From Swiss-Prot:
It is found in: Endoplasmic reticulum membrane; Apical cell membrane. Interacts with SLC34A1; regulates SLC34A1 internalization by PTH and FGF23. The lineage of its organism: Eukaryota, Metazoa, Chordata, Craniata, Vertebrata. It comes from Homo sapiens (Human). One of its GO terms (cellular component) is endoplasmic reticulum membrane. This is Transmembrane protein 174.
Length: 243
């Protein structure tokens, strides 16, 4: 367990939270609608002032000078056009709306776009991963080279292993949570494998006898007897999987 915890500590993963950036009103680019509304508003104000001026000049100077008669017609026309532009800018583009209405309308899209929570960034892996406003649960699998498989009792294995076979008890096998690994029961330096190698060397050394047919029959019988006695049992007999 100490080695496993040490390997987990060696895995470098840095997690830090990042507060989401809320764009200010200065960073928001002016849209085309705002430009058109502002243009209509100032044009309407200018035309309205010119229309008022022409109307006043026509009514004042009309009595003495006859060439100011056109101002009485042009002044009201310019004034009506200017008022129309102002109404379009106010009603359609909302250029003169109240400040509280604007703030309430700006808060609704910001609350919809802004994630509701901090952001978590993982930087100790191949590619950084960022989670916005979500509950992050980190899971690191255990290392593969653990000293002992989980759920295997070494004293139980030592008590049931014998040179020519394995004696299992039903209660102990049922109590195990997971099947034992084959290499833990029969390692490479087991006596069964050593005897098998001795049998193979013995059969190789007996190939120089004068009668090959009789020697092959005897060697085959000896090899079958030795393998039947010292070879490890199959995995299905060691641990039967539940059906």
């Amino acid at each position: 367990m100490e080695q496993g915890s040490g390997r987990l500590e060696d895995f470098p993963v840095n997690v830090f939270s990042v507060t989401p950036y809320t764009p200010s009103t200065a960073d928001i680019q002016v849209s085309d609608d705002d430009k058109a509304g502002a243009t209509l508003l100032f044009s309407g104000i200018f035309l309205g002032l010119v229309g008022i001026t022409f109307t006043v000049m026509g009514w004042i100077k009309y009595q003495g000078v006859s060439h100011f008669e056109w101002t009485q017609l042009l002044g009201p026309v310019l004034l009506s056009v200017g008022v129309t532009f102002i109404l379009i800018a106010v009603c359609k583009f909302k250029m003169l709306s109240c400040q509280l209405c604007k703030e309430s309308e700006e808060r609704v899209p910001d609350s919809e776009q802004t994630p509701g929570g901090p952001s978590f960034v993982f930087t100790g892996i191949n590619q950084p991963i960022t989670f916005h406003g979500a509950t992050v649960v980190q899971y690191i699998p255990p290392p593969y080279g653990s000293p002992e498989p989980m759920g295997i009792n070494t004293s139980y294995l030592q008590s049931v292993v014998s040179p020519c076979g394995l004696i299992t008890s039903g209660g102990a096998a049922a109590a195990m949570s997971s099947p034992p690994q084959y290499y833990t029961i029969y390692p490479q330096d087991n006596s069964a494998f050593v005897v098998d190698e001795g049998c193979l060397s013995f059969t190789d050394g007996g190939n120089h006898r004068p009668n090959p047919d009789v020697d092959q029959l005897e060697e085959t019988q000896l090899e079958e007897e030795a393998c039947a006695c010292f070879s490890p049992p199959p995995y299905e007999e060691i641990y039967s999987l539940p059906r």
